[in-house]
Amino acid sequence: MNTVEQNRKDFVAFVRKQLNKCGIKLNLRASKKHLDGDYGMFCEPDHGAELCVASGMSRDKFFHTLAHEYVHFLQWFADDPLYRASRDDARDYYALEKVTEESALEILDQWGLIPESGQDRIRESSEKYLCSVFVRVPSVRVSRKPLPHKGIKNVKKT
């Protein structure tokens, strides 16, 4: 098994273990998209207690999505004010997704989850996703800096 594949295996085990500590299930669905039309979603304990990711896509896209949804779990766990505010304000939702994407890309790098050959493609995919969020959300103006996420920095592979 090459290094990237081992890192991926370790990351899935790590995420599953962290979720289990909070009574949240990791649900990997054998489809290209999740039931709601997206690639994945995080449901808080009051709303289903699961982190779902469609696994029927490229491995790079799968791990990008898993990292993104895992960051939402970390935001929920830390009771992040931006995470809470994003439910009620479209501008905060865009800001949240921007911070989430930045953190997900950082996790992908820290864990070595994307081979060199796929890194540019994942960054492009991230930019396209943020553009689509911006287009879907009316009158979005982000005027704040991303909040520091202390917990995200400590997610490095040990």
Named regions from a protein language model:
Residues 1, 48-53, 81-89:
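Glycine-/proline-rich flexible loop or hinge segments
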Residues 2-6, 10, 95, 117, ...:
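Alpha-helix boundary/N-cap detector
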Residues 4-22:
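Zn2+-dependent metallopeptidase catalytic core
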Residues 16-61, 73-77:
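Active-site scaffold of zinc-dependent metalloenzymes
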Residues 58-61, 105-158:
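Long, well-structured alpha-helical subdomains associated
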